[in-house]
Amino acid sequence: MYRTYYILACILLALPTTTSAEGLPTAKSPHEWISLFNGKDLSGWTVKITGHPLGQNFGNTFRVEDGVLKVSYDDYKQFDNQYGHLYTDIAYSKYRLRMEYRFAGKMMPDAPKYVNLNSGIMIHSQSPQSIELHQHFPVSLEFQFLADEGKGRRQTGNVCTPGTNLEIDGKLITQHIVKSSAPTFPAHEWVAIEIEVQ
């Protein structure tokens, strides 16, 4: 993985509900946006890193610096398949998500080649409590972030399906990656995305 492999500037969510759980911010209408990230710390989020107990932020992998959420492997001696995931403390099912991301830093020497300039958001996922200690990825549907490696087209926004399948227009899709029609972006460029999940 990258020593600092992607950075989130802001994460906003629009919900079709006004219900609240545990005093966390909620939208008052289906068109109101709420911030999932407070710009200060990881409040409202739970960390899960392969090989480490739920809630342990091994190596300070997920950190907030200057109001930006960063994913960093700076404190790792080696990657050793320690994939990191960050979960919101509230599960969502129907929502719109807006955020920005970019890649920075250099890949760790022992990380698998496929993780180069590769990250994403699990838009539907198994709960963090159900993930096994050494499980690399949650069973999920992932909106994949990719960046240009200088080897030709590498579009962002693919859908990946670790441990599951996808149905599109009534047809079962069993391939792991469903390619998007999005462009290829340079590695250090901020990319704005919006996802609608029904």
What is each of the regions a protein language model found here?
Residues I7-P16:
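Bacterial N-terminal signal peptides
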